[in-house]
Amino acid sequence: MLTRSKAGINKLNPKYSLTITTTIKKEPKSVIFALKDPGWCQAMQEELDALSRNKTWILVPPPVNQNILGCKWVFKTKLHSDGTLDRLKARLVAKGFHQEEGIYFVETYSPVVRTATIRTILNVAQQLEVGQSINWMFKMHFSMGIFKKKFICINLLVLRILFIHPMCVC
């Protein structure tokens, strides 16, 4: 039997003939690599500008008696649906793993009861009809509550390069 490959016929399937090579910026693993690229520098500056514009934090000298949490940059490359570069996104996040469980638990964990859960509990209580009134107390924590201030120390290298005072925390 004579096959196409034995006969020397190398007709490629046309649906596999289109190849596209794109050069998408890789996400940097550290701030040092990100600061070498002007695109990532601009993304970091936009994030810091947004934090200042929204008055998320204020730079103050570090207090001696406060716990200072570290922070890190998280980098993400956003793409369009066709695979082209949309934008570079940099986010400044607190290092939550430096917090101790039990000490910071109230400040970091905020449970919220779903409405469906409340309806289910009240429905079960109504169907039981014990003949006496049942008082239910739900304790909810909302994000609009009063928060204690946390101090986060920003990487000094980033502060010096992005022209922010290096002896401050936010």
From Swiss-Prot:
Pfam families with a match to the protein in the record: RVT_2
Annotated localization: Mitochondrion
This protein's UniProt keywords: Mitochondrion
Entry's Gene Ontology cellular component terms: mitochondrion
Protein known as: Uncharacterized mitochondrial protein AtMg00820
Additional notes on this entry: A stretch of 270 kb of the mitochondrial genome is duplicated within the centromere of chromosome 2 resulting in the duplication of the gene. The expression of this duplicated gene (At2g07683) is not demonstrated.
Major localization class: mitochondrion
